[in-house]
Structures are given as C-alpha cells and as structure tokens.
Amino acid sequence: MSIKMRTMLPIALIGLLLLAACGESTPTPEPTERPLASFDFEDVCRRGTIDRAPAYEPEAGSGRIHPVVVFKRDTADDSYLDLSPSSFELPIPWMVDYGGDFGTVELVVCMTGIESTLAEDCAYEDDDDNEEYMLHVYETTYEVKVYAAHSGEELGSTTVKAEFEACPMFHMFSDKEEDSYVYPPVSPVQEFLQEYVEP
C-alpha cells in the first residue's frame, strides 16, 4: 500500500463518522404549555370552552369547593374585566388570586350591565391646576350567569342591582367628563353562587 493510500484511509473514515453523526437527529422537545391565566376564561363568557379546565362535577354535601373566576362588563358593548379577590370579595377559598393555579378553576361567573340609571353627577377639582372634572355615576342592574369552564354549559343566572351610596373619594380621569357604573354588590352574588361553588 502506498503512502498516499495510507493517508487517505483515515480521512475517509473520519468523513464516514461525521456523516453518521449528522444522520442521528436529536428529538425536538415538545413545547411546554403556558399555565392557564385568569384572562383565558373570558372565552367562556362568550360561549366558548376551556378544554384544559377540570370538569365540573358537583357532589352535594361533599364540602368540596369548585373554584371560580369572575368577569364584569358595564354594558353588553364593553370588554370583560376579570375581577381579583381584592376587588370582589367572595370567600377566600372560592377565587384564585393572581399568581395562583388557574388550572383548578371549574366555574366562570359573567356579570353584564343590562340597565343603568344616572344616580349622581360627582364634581372633582384638581388641586394642582384647579381644573374641574365631572363623574356621572350610574346605578346598574347586572345579569349574572355562571358557566362550567370545561363544557361551557350555562348552569344558572340571576340579576342583581348595584345601588348608589356616595361619590367615590377619588377617580383617575382620562377626560374632563366620564361615566362610572356602581360595582355589583358581593352579598347577593355570593348567595346565588353558593349552590354551585360549595354545594
């Protein structure tokens, strides 16, 4: 065997090994699903479903809690706002707080303002520039519906009236005049939800 042949043989073997290594593909890892967040459940208010939510299977007298997320909109033309436990104070175990595990949520509560009446014009003054601002506050009747998150089934509905008590102590204005709708009262909503959340 010539010297030329001896040097070419190792080079050829290296080439074959490189080709073999290139042929072994590393499996691509499956993308990790993002954990559910509160805003994902808004679809249920629009008659959608959440496949990743656990099925709602109530057992009377079990003492088991079926967690909820709560949404509100002032009129049917508005976007839904998800309410945190600090802004809508249902019993603590009922709602998942921000940063909690929304993968446990079984129920979605959707509140929509269906009738509003002007209750008070609240005047405010900016201490810095003495500009005057006006807040028109409306008493509102809300339609409250509760859905099973996984199936999208409507489980029940009721109406509650949010009544005016006093002008807010302060308000963050974007315009010189704005409308504001009284928040739905917690107590009647809690009474309505009791049989679904804690049967």
Model-predicted regions and their roles:
Residues 141, 157-159:
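Well-ordered beta-strand positions in beta-sheet-rich domains
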Residues 101-149:
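Surface-exposed short loop/turn segments
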Residues 2-11:
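Bacterial N-terminal signal peptides that target proteins for export
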Residues 31-102, 158, 164-199:
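Compositionally biased, intrinsically disordered linkers/stalks adjacent to structured regions
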Residues 23-25:
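Bacterial signal peptide processing site
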